[in-house]
């Protein structure tokens, strides 16, 4: 289990959320949050990066007490997930190692491009977790 997966396990326990892998979700749905049972259902067979990001996103719904999918709720869940999985220190290190190439950075960080772009947007408006002072631009 890598550091990101360990972080997710900790968050699942912290929020008293159960994770169930299932073959019942369609290919269009990687995971879903069921608030009544406090369960995240993740589609069986997801690649590790997609699984981590999908579960973190669904934990964002749990954190915000969402009970339905709206554009605002989806954005909030994405933002929460980005801030849980990334911080400026991690992104700065990946930028150095990957010559600021976004696809390589996402791979190095173990997140989807969507999550990295979400984090970048939050960084630009000052809404990210800070570990170090860095000036990043993920063009």
What spans do the regions from the language model cover?
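Active-site hotspot residues in diverse enzymes, especially metal/ion-binding acidic/histidine motifs
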Residues: 1-139
């Amino acid at each position: 289990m890598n550091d990101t997966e360990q972080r997710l396990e900790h968050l699942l326990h912290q929020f008293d959320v159960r994770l169930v892998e299932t073959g019942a979700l369609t290919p269009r749905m990687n995971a879903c949050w069921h608030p009544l049972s406090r369960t995240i259902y993740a589609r069986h067979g997801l690649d590790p990066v997609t699984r981590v990001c999908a579960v973190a996103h669904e934990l964002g719904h749990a954190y915000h007490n969402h009970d339905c999918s709206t554009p605002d709720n989806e954005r909030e869940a994405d933002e929460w997930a980005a801030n849980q999985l990334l911080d400026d220190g991690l992104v700065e290190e990946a930028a150095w190692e990957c010559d600021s190439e976004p696809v390589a950075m996402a791979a190095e960080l173990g997140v989807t491009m969507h999550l990295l772009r979400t984090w970048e947007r939050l960084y630009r408006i000052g809404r990210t977790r800070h570990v170090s002072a860095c000036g990043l631009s993920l063009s």
